[in-house]
């Protein structure tokens, strides 16, 4: 039996990854495919929640047929989030957010950020960097960190804080703009039609969207005179990518801390959060009372990605769960995965590929 308090139990039926990214206070996570196998209380009102209220409407109806007092949360988690943020005063918390980075999270976030920048030589004198902000927790923190570094840097470099609107709903775009304003980040927004282009693509629309977004970001950054784009991938993204490449791709490769563009001459991609852990990013977010949208595309608005067979989400979730299980046996497993691609013994592999194939 699920532990509950009060007369209403909020059940979030999204996948675990989405739930961890952000959820309604007090909600419990039971993915949709496990809902009918769960021991739910019949003496409580069940409020069923998904991303946008479409999948949860069907699940609530199924529960009512089984005798439960179940209702759908209209608009889902994102509807709740938009309403909550719309009622809040847009308060500038930039100084508090910076103070928390400098003091409470100095070791976990600031030191690891600067270590990444220095060890991999991500930022050099006279660089012009386009900090690419999707509106999520990772890119917003990255923007704040680079803003702080820029203010106190011993050498000159320039920064543009770039947000691409690929077709957000007005409400979702407003959330991104409000969070940027709260954190004191002066964003430049430009528009594209990427969401319309990939919406009817049946196979791997998320992969295609990511590729197109990066191309648009490179192009806009170059137009603004920048020589680098900064993306918000973190340490956990790196180790998950290593395992996903091995287990699903049959190859050994990693997510590089910096990468020269093959299509945009003179442009380079950098990842300043390369050594920052996701759990620490979440702690910083929660400590400062910030809420972000994980993905604000049309698939989110129509609950397409609520489906339990969402391949990209399920694969990454499988890898996260695998790493968590391995960590119970070997606490160093995450570090070992990260370091494995730095310790490749070429004379002890059957074959390898270089840039020439």
Task: Locate each region found by the language model.
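Catalytic subdomain that performs nucleotidyl-dependent activation
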Residues: 158-159, 229, 237-318, 322
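Rhodanese-like catalytic fold shared by cysteine-dependent sulfurtransferases
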Residues: 1-9, 15-45, 51-101, 178
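An accessory alpha-helical subdomain
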Residues: 318-345
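ATP-dependent adenylation/nucleotidyltransferase module used to activate substrates
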Residues: 89-244, 248-252, 256, 279-280, ...
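A short acidic, helix-capping loop that chelates divalent metal ions and anchors anionic groups
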Residues: 19, 81, 196-202, 303-305
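A structural preference for short, hydrophobic beta-strand core positions in alpha/beta folds
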Residues: 29, 72, 161, 189-191, ...
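Short, well-ordered beta-to-alpha junction loops that form the rim of enzyme active sites
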Residues: 14, 231-235, 342
